[in-house]
Swiss-Prot record:
NCBIfam families: tyrS. It comes from Podospora anserina. ATP binds at D104, K325. A motif ('KMSKS' region) lies at residues 322-326. GO terms for cellular component: cytosol; mitochondrial matrix. GO terms for biological process: mRNA processing; tyrosyl-tRNA aminoacylation. It is found in: Mitochondrion matrix. It catalyses: tRNA(Tyr) + L-tyrosine + ATP = L-tyrosyl-tRNA(Tyr) + AMP + diphosphate + H(+). Belongs to the class-I aminoacyl-tRNA synthetase family. This is Tyrosine--tRNA ligase, mitochondrial. L-tyrosine binds at Y100, D144, Y248, Q252, D255, Q274.
């Protein structure tokens, strides 16, 4: 029986063509043992990527280029493995697998310790594998009990939202810097490179419990789970273990399964304490995979489809203290650990540990590291290797402009010439890149704004007050042009009330011109507002009562009585006291007028200013005139 093309829908037609062998097979479809169809252009990219991968494998076999796994071992990234070295090596040679590492947002910033398991992910991405970073928005509500005798204090909902938002954008910034580092080191990005920052709340918030229990619970035996050291120690020596803590490694394993079947993530990389969770995760993925009830969706097992993983070593400094903890943690948030302090932290590393840190925390080729250590050994007092380490780490965490600027600032402060092998220090080209960060640039929840502003003023004024716009009119334009975004639950409607806001699953929706009272629909837990402009300019704002705001003594841009009027009165006071000359006051006024200039096509009439501002302006101009010509004030002359 034949069918005409018009008698079936497009989806069925594609399915029939695929089943008939008329279409190619994707990477994940091969893993599942079924075919999917792609268009000819997309298929050409897949074919080229596969050909490039096979060519790369041949070069590795011939010894022309180094195997990525061998590089991991050489640089010291590998501690314990789930799967043998040879199995992992063969898998990475023949298959473009994906790898991930997970981070629970239990604190508002990543620290140097988090960077170590991220480095192999970054390396794999540069070598053509998929690199994923997972934020545990769901698992953070439970808390990882590994190596703990006392349960974690539950996070407040607003704290979790703040932590999740800040870490998400720290990871995005890190990935942008990784792209920059790849270009520096001569890696040519191709179509097959894949990376992502994901949040496990995305699937846990819609996952039926019965599916987890049926596909996972039936086959996971209690004996092995109870025999884990974490469980035994917490139950015998600690405060006991809750059921939610007991299921934490299973939740982590399900995360892996979700990315395994959806994205081909076959490897997990974790910190030195995560080996037990990785082993449980391997077992979880296999169990859920084998319990797939739909034969069409079932993924075959075998060495080339089984999950693998490894842990990175525990780093300690020369004093035996856990790395990053010796003098307070070295945070990746520049408002908790400044670029200068982070640079200084690595400059202070001992000669005994600097070579190991260069291998672990930089993308420098081994020959460059060996050459730097040779130069360093000739005169250790110059700390050449330490400066190279500090420069590279700051470049990875904050970008290369920050690395150059910080090294030059360090040189200027201590008056010593800095020699960094292979680097010619330069000042950043753009003037704005040399400007110290403002507190308004920090995505901190202690950025507070009063309730009267959040609930009673336009969104344009809120953007101005939050430092995302230079004026209220610019904030208005951002809202009109949908150039700024507000934190909301995926699919959130402005007509809904704030009860639908989920504090562990956040997306951003474009800001529009809405009524002031509608801003309340975006408050998280009734007091937290998250705004964004561009890719990484984030404001996490806590709404406080007007009384609390007044007592704090803070002001915000555009606050009544604190803007132009305050500036005019300050200028008048300083002019009368002789602290400023008339010319300096004029220059300040000119700069202020330029900053507050209306947008093109918008006419601002003088009488739109308040009477107090017009009067203060006149008083200031009279005082300038008096200072310039001397004698009585113009007002007194006119009265006479």
């Amino acid at each position: 029986m034949s069918m005409s093309r018009g008698s079936v829908c497009r989806r069925c037609l594609l399915t029939m063509k695929s089943m008939a062998g008329g279409g190619p097979t994707s990477t994940y479809a091969q893993q599942r043992g079924k075919k999917t169809w792609h268009g000819p252009k997309y298929q050409a990219k897949i074919d080229q990527a596969q050909a490039d991968w096979e060519e790369r494998a041949e070069k590795i076999k011939k010894g022309e280029i180094q195997h990525t796994w061998d590089m991991f071992v050489e640089r010291g990234y590998v501690k314990d493995t789930a799967g043998s070295h040879e199995t992992i090596r063969k898998l990475m040679l023949h298959k473009r697998i994906g790898a991930y590492t997970g981070i629970d947002p239990t604190a508002p910033s990543l620290h140097i310790g988090h960077l170590l398991p991220l480095m192999p992910i970054f390396w794999m991405y540069m070598h053509g594998y998929a690199g994923y970073t997972l934020i545990g928005g769901a698992t953070a509500k439970i808390g990882d009990p590994t190596d703990r005798l006392v349960s974690r204090t539950p996070l407040k909902r607003t704290d979790l939202t703040m932590n999740l938002t800040k870490i998400h954008y720290q990871l995005k910034a890190l990935w942008m810097n990784v792209e920059e580092q790849a270009r520096r080191r001569g890696f040519e990005k191709d179509w097959a490179w894949k990376r992502a920052v994901v949040n496990n709340s995305t699937w846990w918030n819609s996952l039926p419990l019965i599916e987890v229990l049926k596909r996972l619970g039936d086959s996971m035996r209690m004996g092995p789970l109870l025999s884990r050291d974490t469980v035994k120690n917490k139950m015998s020596k600690g405060d006991g273990m809750s059921f939610s803590e007991f299921t934490y490694p299973l939740m982590q394993g399900w995360d892996w399964w979700h990315m395994y079947q959806a994205n081909g993530i076959q490897m997990q990389i974790g910190g030195s304490d995560q080996y037990g969770n990785i082993v449980t995760g391997v077992e979880t993925v296999k169990v859920v995979r084998d319990n797939e009830p739909d034969p069409a969706k079932k993924i075959e097992g075998g060495p080339f489809n089984d999950p693998v993983g490894f842990t990175v070593p525990l780093l300690t400094d020369s004093a035996g203290v856990k790395f990053g903890k010796s003098a307070g943690n070295a945070f990746l948030d520049k408002f908790q650990t400044s670029e200068f302090d982070l640079y200084g932290y690595f400059v202070r590393r001992s000669d005994q540990e600097v070579e190991k840190l260069l291998k672990l925390f930089t993308f420098l080729p081994m020959e460059n590291i060996n050459e730097a250590m040779k130069i360093h050994s000739e005169n250790p007092a110059r700390r050449v290797a330490q400066h190279l380490l500090a420069f590279e780490v700051v470049g990875l965490v904050h970008g290369m402009n920050a690395a150059h600027r910080t090294a030059l600032n360090h040189q200027a402060r201590y008056g010593k010439q800095i020699d960094i092998p292979g680097v010619t220090l330069r000042m950043p080209k753009a003037a704005t890149e040399d400007t110290p960060p403002s507190i308004l640039d920090a995505p901190k929840m202690d950025m507070q704004l009063p309730e009267s502003l959040i609930m009673g003023k336009s969104i344009g004024r809120i953007l101005y007050a939050a430092g995302l716009a230079k004026s209220a009119s610019e904030g208005h334009r951002l809202a009109t042009q949908q150039g700024a975004y507000i934190g909301a639950m995926p699919g959130h409607k402005r007509t809904e009330d704030n009860k639908v806001m989920d504090y562990s699953q956040l997306s951003f929706t474009p800001i529009k011109l809405w009524f002031p009272q509608e801003t309340r629909n975006y408050l998280i837990d009734g007091k937290l507002l998250i705004l964004r402009k561009g890719k990484v300019q984030i404001r996490v704002i806590e709404m406080v009562s007007d009384e609390e705001w007044k007592e704090s003594g803070q002001t915000y841009p555009g606050e009544p009585g604190t803007g132009a009027l305050r500036m005019l009165r300050q200028q008048l006071k300083m002019l009368k006291s002789g602290m400023l000359t008339p010319d300096e006051v004029k220059a300040n006024l000119k700069n202020h007028v330029e900053e507050e200039a209306p947008p093109p096509g918008f006419m601002k009439f003088p009488d739109q200013d308040s009477y107090a501002i017009r009067r203060a302006t006149q008083e200031l101009m009279d005082e300038i005139h008096q200072k310039e010509v001397g004698g009585d004030s113009p007002r007194e002359e006119r009265r006479e």
